[in-house]
Amino acid sequence: MLQCKNVTKKYMKMTAVNGVSIDFMPGRIYALLGSNGSGKTTLMKMVAGLVKPTSGDITLSGVPIGVETKKHIAYMPTESYFYNYMSCADIGKYYADFFEDFSLDQYYNYLNEMKLTPDMKASKMSSGMMAKLKLAVNLSRNASVIMLDEPLNGVDIVAREQVINAVISKASPDKIIIMSSHLVDELEAVIDYAVFIKDGVIVSQGDAENLRTASGMSIVDQYKRIYAY
């Protein structure tokens, strides 16, 4: 279990995440939903161990987030993080050397599914192709926690189905999958649990089906109600 207890992150006078508490259980796909600047990315970075909370605790299987937990967490940020000169094959080799849980066989299978070839250079990729490459890299790890920050950003409508199918294929009883997005309609049929974050605070969370039943609204319509200006 991945557990966040009263987690807060402040940058000077700005509070990016405020008192967040949530338990992420294996075998489920979670969606962190919210508009830009709501705190989704900051929360993910704290779970990944890239940013330290100002207060509160984050643990994975009872172990505080740190050096020991990083090897069990795969985190895909929104930014591109590959050198331009690298090809897909270079990137696969780099990750295989760096992460013991990285599978080159899975990686090449994902590349094929995403219509990417080993000789493609990072410098020549569109934003959509880069998004699919980042996804292939992270899904090829056998990590306990897989976090994907805005995995559908820059991906066209046709390719979104490829991305979603790839995520579903990775789901298993021993893995926690967390995705952040503001493209809620694309994720509604996939997610097991929805977390609505606004101004750094969780304003609603729960099993997706229970939320629909209790509100009489789809996750998409709940999103519109919560984030309507």
Specify the residue positions occupied by each region the protein language model found.
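ABC ATPase "signature
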Residues: Q205-G206
